[in-house]
């Protein structure tokens, strides 16, 4: 028995060592291929491209592959690592040689490096993340959250169809096809309609296959939908469609700004897809998982909904109060953002607090089961604020008041002051909602069903949620600034 116990640690060490070797070699191989491809596209030295791809792939395989437990998780971790590479390495090199340059000049240099961002995401982060995620999924036998093909096909396929029909009908009324921006201009109208629906269906179907284990409720589905939609903007309008159309790739800021409106369209579609997927997935869970008496809630759904609306309204009001000084200082409150309609300061503040209360109620419904700690509540609040900046002042508000929307980069840049107000509002709303919820839960933790519910809210170790927050927030904020 003693000899067996001495052997077991050695076997474990050898398995960990072999896993690191396998992940490192796979990351190295895919990274070299991706680095050489991005070197050809950007016309960079093959040696530099080789070293960059090899180094990124090797480091990702050694330090991040253990978190890539599925293709979807690997994809998100790979994209966030590629974004971090673009932000840190070139920025560090620039700062070392900046010699006191003005911030405006550094912003211009960052705009010049936008093609590198596209290359890092598509040639390094995406393929390396997916490859190591597939390897991790084959190696991982997750008994607690097994992958269900039926759930992925039903929820992903039908949500892609439903959201594609809704989004397609909405865009069709304005004769606008953002999901196929970059496609040939001489295409017929029926061809554009078909292609847009096909792209929407593809995004929806792959969403369920990639992120089934990661999404929980409406809030996380919308967050993952936002991040996945941003990736598809890089894949589709910036790369794939121009290649199919026979035009030259233009990854510069000027070229990408021509299809910036498509980015907003992709984000809105991602949000619609997230809501549709969460609805269908919840129906599946209710039918096949929560029908088990051991997993039933201790409270009725109506009571939980009413309580979430109450907490959300109070949290939203507090968020509106705390974000109002920034809104007043930037001149956002006296105006209906971007519409040129002037209001008195008192009227603008009252309208801001009223809207903040209603938006807080939506946070209570959408994100009530997402945050398990104070830090995660603030992160989801940031995502919530970013979502409503794209959905509110960029889309719904002008659409309701004027019947038109302006998604040009110049128009969106003028709304940047309200973006930071939305982020502060979202973070405060998320934190306040968590405090109210935790205060209530602390009085009912003796109920074993409450304890089980809290345990289900905890995300497993290595969850890609932090990577999603970094990727979605980073690009959701950076792209409007770069294109302004």
Task: Go through the PLM ranges and name each one.
Residues 2-484:
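Juxtamembrane/disordered regions of integral membrane proteins
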